[in-house]
Amino acid sequence: MDERDMVKRVKVFASSELKLNILLCLKYREMDVNDLQGVLGGRNTTILHAIRDMTDDYLISRGRQGYRLTNLGKIRGCVLESLMGVLDDLEARPDFWLNHDISSIPPEMLERLSMLRRSEMVSTNPASPLEIHERLESLLSTSKKISAILPLLIFPKDSKVFTNALRRGSRVDLLMTEKIAGSLLDDGSISAYEVERLLKFESFRLRLIGEDLKLALFVTESFLYLGLYRHDGVYDVGTGAIYLGESAVAWGMELFEYYAQRSRELDEGDLTRVFRSSIQPEAEAPPLAGEDPGAFDVMIVEDDLGHATLIRRIFEESSPRWRVHHASQLQDALRWIEESYGRPFLVVADYLLPDGCGLDLAGKAERPLEVGFPLIILTGFGSEKIAAQAFKSGAMDYVVKEADSIQRLPEIAEEALLRWRELKRRAAGGEGHPSPQEGQGLPLKV
């Protein structure tokens, strides 16, 4: 039978809603015509006619207590239920599957998406783009077994998610890409020695894979978390799916094992060698349009470590030219600005900080050039009053902490730098107010 004939047969069978319902009703127990009528409604004669057709197709046979499925009927019922499960999941969250890159999910795993029927979808709150990761971290804090695939740093580098799990006796099987393994050492926040300490736990396994994976996966004894990259190549930090139940966990473990078999396990002896080779500098990327060659310093002034990590990652993933720094307090930022005098930089500062306001960095300035550097203000809530205050204090831009706006920060920074250079050009040509030296503005009011 060729494919066209098979399509015709499937179409004939699928076109009968009654036959499909009979197949599902008989999947778990024998039923007579009256039982089927009680569940499905309709006339006995109509049900009997459908049963006759299904008997001729060897899908149904007579049993002691009524009608039952043959082996062919049971197989077709399982296929039907699987198809319904896939359609149910796709219809429940079409945006999740439509707007993300699923190339790292093998075709055989996509065929078994019906295993994810029992699920809960957690989407970001626009005012809290890290809500999904906070929820994930909370669930992991009580998990006894964690198998994870990390193509990027989901949590802050100083997060204790895995360390705490090992200390309470949980098993942790961690699979990382070579790229993320190298980034663990890039700023000294974690060292090979510290990872070696984790490897001393018998319940900890560390694997490395050279493929560029486009998914993040966490599987525990009770749930599965799946995070995907958008089609533009950026990981979607604001949206993920949490699936509950044994079937979903089984699907997640199959996906984990698929990549675990393609990875290599590390021990204490080869850990340092692997990390050193993974962080060899890559070829310098060409400068962005309108930019001078070389790196550009960006200071993130943010007391929320999770938000700061997210913003750092967005900048670093957008271009290797961004050299990102972080300060959690105003005084630390002021000290860095003073030390950076004489070289160009940009500051992205939260409006509310533990020891002041992000606008305090502008001092007594009323115009951008009087600030002495491009300043972008972040806030967790939109306010026309704050926006007006920001611009009156010389800020180049004002950004509300919403998922889309945070993702666009590198683009917003580029636009701010272009406007900043244009302001300096005009000032140098006598078209505007005099320009202070780069990094030197009016006295700060802290």
UniProtKB/Swiss-Prot annotation:
Keyword annotations from UniProtKB, A to Z: DNA-binding, Phosphoprotein, Transcription, Transcription regulation, Two-component regulatory system
InterPro entries, A to Z: CheY-like_superfamily (IPR011006), FilR1_middle_dom (IPR013561), Sig_transdc_resp-reg_receiver (IPR001789), WalR-like (IPR039420), WH_DNA-bd_sf (IPR036390)
Post-translational modification: Phosphorylated by FilI.
SMART domains: REC
Location of 4-aspartylphosphate modifications: D350
Domain Response regulatory residues, every copy: 297-416
One Pfam family in the UniProt entry: Response_reg
GO BP annotations listed: regulation of DNA-templated transcription
Induction details: Autoregulated.
GO function terms (MF aspect): phosphorelay response regulator activity; transcription cis-regulatory region binding
GO cellular component: cytosol; protein-DNA complex
Role description: Member of the two-component regulatory system FilI/FilRs, which is involved in the regulation of methanogenesis. Regulates its own expression, expression of the filI-filR2 operon, and of genes involved in methanogenesis such as acs1, acs4 and mtrABC. Acts by binding to the promoters.
Name of the molecule in the record: Methanogenesis regulatory protein FilR1
Organism from which the protein derives: Methanothrix harundinacea (strain 6Ac) (Methanosaeta harundinacea)
Higher taxonomy: Archaea, Methanobacteriati, Methanobacteriota, Stenosarchaea group, Methanomicrobia
